[in-house]
């Protein structure tokens, strides 16, 4: 009998495709794949651990609280979304605190950036301004907000560049970008 490991379960789910998510067997495999197992007693035995029947969470009635073990991947993403938005958000009040114009205040949430970068991706490369290209280069090199300010990058150019480079930018860089926006607003 083949033991179902999380890797095997994920492999089967990926092979089955998204249309198969309604199948009860695929749902069960998805649960097996998302279980958060307790750490093994020996470090070298981590790779040898397999799921037991007792590891599989029982179905929970609607309205009841659910263990983190039984969360689907998209439910985990939904729970993390507010944290991401808090991490990468700047409000009109933040920018206005330094007496800056309110026009610089943008809804800079993770979801907003992610959705809007898709449209910006359609911009032909020859239509990207020199200023935006400079900002993109600085973002890629993880420039500090002082370096961005010295290069004369405006908030709007920075936002355009950020939307174009978001898939390749790590959270630390995006964080620095938000600090840069606030820095400009407080000048």
Swiss-Prot record:
GO CC annotations on file: extracellular region; host cell
Localization, UniProt: Secreted; Host cell
Motif (RxLR-dEER): 49-66
Keyword Secreted set for record: yes
Transmembrane segments: none
Residue ranges the record marks as coiled coil: none
Keywords for this protein: Secreted, Signal, Virulence
Region forming the signal peptide: 1-20
Superkingdom classification of source: Eukaryota
Similarity comment: family membership: Belongs to the RxLR effector family.
Record's miscellaneous remark: ATR39 has 2 polymorphic alleles that are highly conserved among Hyaloperonospora arabidopsidis isolate. This conservation is in stark contrast with other characterized H.arabidopsidis effectors ATR1, ATR5 and ATR13, which are highly divergent. The presence of amino acids Glu-168 and Val-169 in ATR39-2 blocks recognition by host defense protein RPP39.
Domain notes: The RxLR-dEER motif acts to carry the protein into the host cell cytoplasm through binding to cell surface phosphatidylinositol-3-phosphate.
Annotated function: Secreted effector that acts as an elicitor of hypersensitive response (HR) specifically on plants carrying defense protein RPP39. The allele ATR39-1 is recognized by RPP39, whereas the ATR39-2 allele is nor recognized.
Name of the protein this chain belongs to: Avirulence protein ATR39-2
Species, as recorded: Hyaloperonospora arabidopsidis (strain Emoy2)
Gene: ATR39-2
């Amino acid at each position: 009998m083949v033991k179902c490991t999380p890797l095997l379960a994920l492999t089967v789910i990926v092979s089955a495709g998204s249309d198969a998510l309604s199948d009860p067997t695929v749902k069960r495999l998805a649960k097996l794949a998302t279980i958060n197992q307790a750490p093994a007693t020996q470090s070298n035995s981590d790779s040898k651990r397999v799921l037991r029947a007792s590891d599989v969470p029982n179905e929970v009635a609607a309205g009841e609280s659910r263990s983190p073990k039984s969360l689907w991947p998209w439910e985990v993403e939904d729970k993390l979304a507010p944290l991401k938005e808090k991490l990468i958000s700047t409000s009109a009040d933040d920018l206005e605190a330094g007496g800056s114009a309110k026009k610089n205040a943008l809804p800079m949430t993770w979801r907003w950036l992610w959705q809007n970068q898709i449209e910006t991706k359609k911009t032909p490369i020859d239509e990207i301004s020199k200023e935006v290209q400079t900002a993109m280069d600085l973002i890629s090199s993880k420039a500090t907000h002082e370096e961005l300010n010295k290069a004369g990058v405006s908030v709007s150019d920075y936002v355009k560049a950020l939307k174009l480079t978001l898939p390749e930018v790590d959270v630390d860089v995006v964080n620095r970008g938000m600090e840069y926006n606030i820095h400009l607003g407080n000048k």
